[in-house]
């Protein structure tokens, strides 16, 4: 689950990390009120969307008067921002962040991730702030300094000081950075984060360190023990189909193809997409109904797939282990009847009650094509959508 920048900065502040003064605004009047409460005569206005690249897309503006602030706020709110990280429709701008400006002397990068290779939380710092860290990692990886955090003791002060020296910090800045990095490490673990980025972490002309931007991703598997953070979820920034899938505990990821996929098991789902591509098709989604799929969940999964206008055909690939194939067949037929599916549906059932499931499908007299194997299913659905 992603947080907006203003939410990330609220969390930063609660852990003692320095952030610019500012508030979120949902209309022009709120934006002007926030500006009147700040001591600066210039303000930064930032569109709040779950996507990077806002600056280049016009989602970050520097304003020097309240008239200009009102005009910018009006032009942003209620629109959709398209960046290199969004689709062609962009993300809705329902809120803006109005902040005081600061005089920047230098930009740094500070972040943390769960690193699979070390199976630890790894904190990363770089002198190359203000640019995408992926670009730095690709072009100049030696400029990224990594700290592996021992889960038994957490971030240690000596690690913070060593990192500060590598970043070229001096005197009081080292103390500031140590406090900041320790807070970041504690917050990462306390809040069950999977990603945290401060980019840029700036040094002002007066020598102060400030978190000028913030990005936070929370581990979705840990939300049950993070009720306050869960309440920060903004479903308007998420795909409607993904939200519906989440409500039914379905693992759904939209893709760009034309063949909808419904499979039980993540590995089988990926193999199914591979076979579709092997035979000249393009999958429209990844959808795993899970090992404990019910008739109702299968029916809902099919409805979600059909709601994607790009989908021209559907491949259902079910291996019956825990789940019975006859129940899957009933769910498929119920959904096909309810939604009035006009596109071809190819179904491959294998395992527990597979023969019974196939008989149910064959007797249905609906536009459902039975397949004897995964290869057969892929060939049939690719041929069907090509007609």
Swiss-Prot record:
<dbReference type="InterPro" id="IPR011761">
    <property type="entry name" value="ATP-grasp"/>
</dbReference>
<dbReference type="GO" id="GO:0004775">
    <property type="term" value="F:succinate-CoA ligase (ADP-forming) activity"/>
</dbReference>
<feature type="binding site">
    <location>
        <position position="199"/>
    </location>
    <ligand>
        <name>Mg(2+)</name>
    </ligand>
</feature>
<keyword id="KW-0547">Nucleotide-binding</keyword>
<dbReference type="InterPro" id="IPR017866">
    <property type="entry name" value="Succ-CoA_synthase_bsu_CS"/>
</dbReference>
<dbReference type="Pfam" id="PF08442">
    <property type="entry name" value="ATP-grasp_2"/>
</dbReference>
<feature type="binding site">
    <location>
        <begin position="321"/>
        <end position="323"/>
    </location>
    <ligand>
        <name>substrate</name>
    </ligand>
</feature>
<dbReference type="InterPro" id="IPR013815">
    <property type="entry name" value="ATP_grasp_subdomain_1"/>
</dbReference>
<protein>
    <recommendedName>
        <fullName>Succinate--CoA ligase [ADP-forming] subunit beta</fullName>
        <ecNumber>6.2.1.5</ecNumber>
    </recommendedName>
</protein>
<dbReference type="GO" id="GO:0005524">
    <property type="term" value="F:ATP binding"/>
</dbReference>
<feature type="binding site">
    <location>
        <position position="46"/>
    </location>
    <ligand>
        <name>ATP</name>
    </ligand>
</feature>
<dbReference type="InterPro" id="IPR005809">
    <property type="entry name" value="Succ_CoA_ligase-like_bsu"/>
</dbReference>
<dbReference type="GO" id="GO:0006104">
    <property type="term" value="P:succinyl-CoA metabolic process"/>
</dbReference>
<dbReference type="GO" id="GO:0004776">
    <property type="term" value="F:succinate-CoA ligase (GDP-forming) activity"/>
</dbReference>
<comment type="pathway">
    <text>Carbohydrate metabolism; tricarboxylic acid cycle; succinate from succinyl-CoA (ligase route): step 1/1.</text>
</comment>
<feature type="binding site">
    <location>
        <position position="264"/>
    </location>
    <ligand>
        <name>substrate</name>
    </ligand>
</feature>
<comment type="similarity">
    <text>Belongs to the succinate/malate CoA ligase beta subunit family.</text>
</comment>
<comment type="function">
    <text>Succinyl-CoA synthetase functions in the citric acid cycle (TCA), coupling the hydrolysis of succinyl-CoA to the synthesis of either ATP or GTP and thus represents the only step of substrate-level phosphorylation in the TCA. The beta subunit provides nucleotide specificity of the enzyme and binds the substrate succinate, while the binding sites for coenzyme A and phosphate are found in the alpha subunit.</text>
</comment>
<dbReference type="InterPro" id="IPR005811">
    <property type="entry name" value="SUCC_ACL_C"/>
</dbReference>
<feature type="binding site">
    <location>
        <position position="102"/>
    </location>
    <ligand>
        <name>ATP</name>
    </ligand>
</feature>
<keyword id="KW-0067">ATP-binding</keyword>
<keyword id="KW-0460">Magnesium</keyword>
<keyword id="KW-0479">Metal-binding</keyword>
<dbReference type="GO" id="GO:0005829">
    <property type="term" value="C:cytosol"/>
</dbReference>
<dbReference type="GO" id="GO:0042709">
    <property type="term" value="C:succinate-CoA ligase complex"/>
</dbReference>
<dbReference type="Pfam" id="PF00549">
    <property type="entry name" value="Ligase_CoA"/>
</dbReference>
<feature type="binding site">
    <location>
        <position position="99"/>
    </location>
    <ligand>
        <name>ATP</name>
    </ligand>
</feature>
<feature type="binding site">
    <location>
        <position position="107"/>
    </location>
    <ligand>
        <name>ATP</name>
    </ligand>
</feature>
<dbReference type="GO" id="GO:0006099">
    <property type="term" value="P:tricarboxylic acid cycle"/>
</dbReference>
<comment type="subunit">
    <text>Heterotetramer of two alpha and two beta subunits.</text>
</comment>
<keyword id="KW-0436">Ligase</keyword>
<feature type="binding site">
    <location>
        <position position="213"/>
    </location>
    <ligand>
        <name>Mg(2+)</name>
    </ligand>
</feature>
<dbReference type="InterPro" id="IPR016102">
    <property type="entry name" value="Succinyl-CoA_synth-like"/>
</dbReference>
<keyword id="KW-0816">Tricarboxylic acid cycle</keyword>
<feature type="binding site">
    <location>
        <begin position="53"/>
        <end position="55"/>
    </location>
    <ligand>
        <name>ATP</name>
    </ligand>
</feature>
<feature type="domain" description="ATP-grasp">
    <location>
        <begin position="9"/>
        <end position="244"/>
    </location>
</feature>
<dbReference type="GO" id="GO:0000287">
    <property type="term" value="F:magnesium ion binding"/>
</dbReference>
<dbReference type="InterPro" id="IPR013650">
    <property type="entry name" value="ATP-grasp_succ-CoA_synth-type"/>
</dbReference>
């Amino acid at each position: 689950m992603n947080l907006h920048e203003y939410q990330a900065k609220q969390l930063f502040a609660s852990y003692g990390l320095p952030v610019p003064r500012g508030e979120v605004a949902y209309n022009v009047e709120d934006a002007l009120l926030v500006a009147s409460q700040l001591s600066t005569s210039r303000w930064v206005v930032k569109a709040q969307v779950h996507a990077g690249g806002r600056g280049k897309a016009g989602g970050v503006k520097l304003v020097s008067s309240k008239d200009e602030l009102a005009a910018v706020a009006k032009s942003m709110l209620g629109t959709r921002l398209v960046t290199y990280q969004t689709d062609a429709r962009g993300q809705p701008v329902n809120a803006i962040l109005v902040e005081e400006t600061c005089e920047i002397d230098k930009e740094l990068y500070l972040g943390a991730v769960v690193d699979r290779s070390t199976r630890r939380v790894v904190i990363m710092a770089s002198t190359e702030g203000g640019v995408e860290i992926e670009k730095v990692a690709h072009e100049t990886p030696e400029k990224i300094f990594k700290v592996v955090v021992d889960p038994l003791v957490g971030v240690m002060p000596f690690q913070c000081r060593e990192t500060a020296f590598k970043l070229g910090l001096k005197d009081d800045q080292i103390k500031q950075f140590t406090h900041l990095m320790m807070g970041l490490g504690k917050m990462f673990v306390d809040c069950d984060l999977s990603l945290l980025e401060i980019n840029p972490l700036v040094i002002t002309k007066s020598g102060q360190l400030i978190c000028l931007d913030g990005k936070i991703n929370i581990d979705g598997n840990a939300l049950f023990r993070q009720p306050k953070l869960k309440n920060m979820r903004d479903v308007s920034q998420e795909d409607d189909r993904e939200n519906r899938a989440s409500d039914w505990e379905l693992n759904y990821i939209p893709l760009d193809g034309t063949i909808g996929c419904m499979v039980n098991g993540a590995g089988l789902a990926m193999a199914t997409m591979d076979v579709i591509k092997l035979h000249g098709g393009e999958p429209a989604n990844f959808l795993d109904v899970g090992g404990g799929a019910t008739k109702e969940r299968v029916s809902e999964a099919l409805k979600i797939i059909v709601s994607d206008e790009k989908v021209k055909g559907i491949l259902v690939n079910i291996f019956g282990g825990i789940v019975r194939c006859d129940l899957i067949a009933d769910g498929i037929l119920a959904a096909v009847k309810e939604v009035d599916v006009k596109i071809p549906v190819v179904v491959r059932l294998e395992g527990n009650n597979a023969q019974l499931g196939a008989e149910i499908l064959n007797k249905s007299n609906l536009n459902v094509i039975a397949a004897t194997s995964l290869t057969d299913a892929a060939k049939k659905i690719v041929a069907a959508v090509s007609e």
